[in-house]
């Protein structure tokens, strides 16, 4: 053992290697600062401040727009270096002063009036959330403590489930539901532009776990002939806006019953459940839809790990998303894992279309 340690030390005799190794270690340790700086910029409404200032703003402009005390100006400069280095915002020299502008990423942080199609500021607040982050600091306990075996990392950290907090904390629940609406709008805008054929020939659709109906509204607007039903828990559909005449909201439990329709949509639902529960949900879906020769299918929108763009960012996003979902004992699946639960639920075939970058459309046929 001692000899092996000595050999490993000798492999790092180069000063350059040691320096590079230390830099990489620090870089990994400080990676969370990217997320917290992004969250801070989102909560400070930096994107909106730049937008209100004509699309470009100095530090002084930002401070004035967001009502920042002058003593915090130098700290704002330090904070803004993080999202500019990582490409969330752009910066250039303007007469010796830093001038910040929006990028395609920071435009997604614009709040607008709540109706902006491409807005994800609330999603950032859900993903980079102190409750969620604390859960990941409990993962080691979840792995090693026997009494934690039947709990999620979130329960280990907080003594209750994530869903209980969403249901009982009005503010947290509102942010979460708004985030799901935002994400649905962006996803459906892409799908309806790039892969609208998945909805062709459908006369009725049930969006299972469809929240406030953002996905259903997009489908009903693009395909007025499709009668859409949104199924979600009673307290969620009770708060849903009734803005579209072609959408019906039904309160219920998708483990117990799913209304009959040509097609069932499951968008970002199954990744929150383990395989046995996914099989139960899919069997309920199979009971609700038409036969395959009559156009019946289940449309799933989820990550398929290993399928999609080969660039490092989307590949890494899939892996990070998978570990992120551990906090509620969820999982992002590879194709063979999806296939296993489809067959166990009684489906005969499926088709994967990687149209959403790191996420895909999966059409599953009875």
From Swiss-Prot:
Its EC number is 2.1.1.4. SUPFAM superfamilies: S-adenosyl-L-methionine-dependent methyltransferases, Winged helix' DNA-binding domain. Signal peptide: none annotated. Pfam families: Dimerisation, Methyltransf_2. The active site is at residues 271, 302, 332. Keywords: Cytoplasm, Melatonin biosynthesis, Methyltransferase, S-adenosyl-L-methionine, Transferase. S-adenosyl-L-homocysteine binds at residues 209, 232, 253, 267. It catalyses: N-acetylserotonin + S-adenosyl-L-methionine = melatonin + S-adenosyl-L-homocysteine + H(+). Methyltransferase which catalyzes the transfer of a methyl group onto N-acetylserotonin, producing melatonin (N-acetyl-5-methoxytryptamine). Homodimer. This is Acetylserotonin O-methyltransferase 3. The lineage of its organism: Eukaryota, Viridiplantae, Streptophyta, Embryophyta, Tracheophyta.
């Amino acid at each position: 053992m001692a000899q092996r340690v000595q050999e490993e030390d000798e492999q790092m005799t180069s000063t350059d290697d040691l320096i590079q190794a230390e830099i990489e270690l620090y870089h990994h340790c400080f990676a969370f600062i990217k997320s917290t700086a992004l969250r801070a910029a989102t909560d400070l409404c930096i994107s909106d401040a730049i937008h209100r200032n004509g699309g470009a703003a100095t530090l002084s402009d930002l401070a004035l727009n967001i009502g920042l005390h002058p003593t915090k100006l130098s700290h704002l400069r330090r904070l803004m270096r993080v999202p500019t280095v990582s490409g969330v915002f752009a910066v250039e020299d303007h007469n010796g002063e830093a001038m910040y502008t929006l990028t395609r990423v920071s435009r997604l942080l614009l709040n607008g009036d709540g109706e902006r199609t491409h807005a994800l500021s609330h999603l950032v607040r859900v993903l980079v959330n102190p409750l969620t982050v604390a859960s990941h600091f409990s993962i080691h306990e979840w792995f090693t403590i026997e009494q934690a075996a039947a709990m999620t990392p979130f329960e280990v950290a907080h003594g209750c489930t994530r869903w209980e907090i969403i249901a009982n904390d009005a503010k947290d629940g509102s942010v979460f539901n708004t985030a799901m609406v935002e994400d649905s709008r962006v996803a459906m805008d892409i799908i309806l532009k790039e892969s609208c054929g998945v909805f062709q020939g459908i006369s009725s659709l049930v969006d299972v776990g469809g929240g406030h109906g953002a996905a259903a509204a997009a489908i009903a607007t693009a395909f007025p002939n499709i009668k859409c039903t949104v199924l979600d828990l009673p307290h969620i559909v009770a708060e849903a806006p009734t803005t579209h005449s072609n959408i019906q909201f039904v309160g219920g439990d998708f483990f117990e019953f799913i209304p009959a329709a040509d097609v069932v949509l499951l968008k970002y639902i199954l990744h929150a459940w383990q395989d046995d529960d996914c099989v139960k949900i899919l069997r309920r879906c199979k009971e609700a839809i038409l036969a395959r020769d009559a156009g019946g299918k289940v449309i799933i929108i989820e990550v398929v790990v290993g399928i999609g763009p080969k660039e490092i960012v989307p590949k890494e996003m899939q892996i990070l998303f998978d570990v992120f979902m551990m906090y509620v004992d969820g999982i992002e699946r590879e194709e063979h894992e999806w296939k296993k639960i489809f067959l166990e639920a009684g489906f005969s075939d499926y088709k994967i279309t990687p149209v959403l970058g790191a996420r895909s459309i999966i059409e599953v046929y009875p």
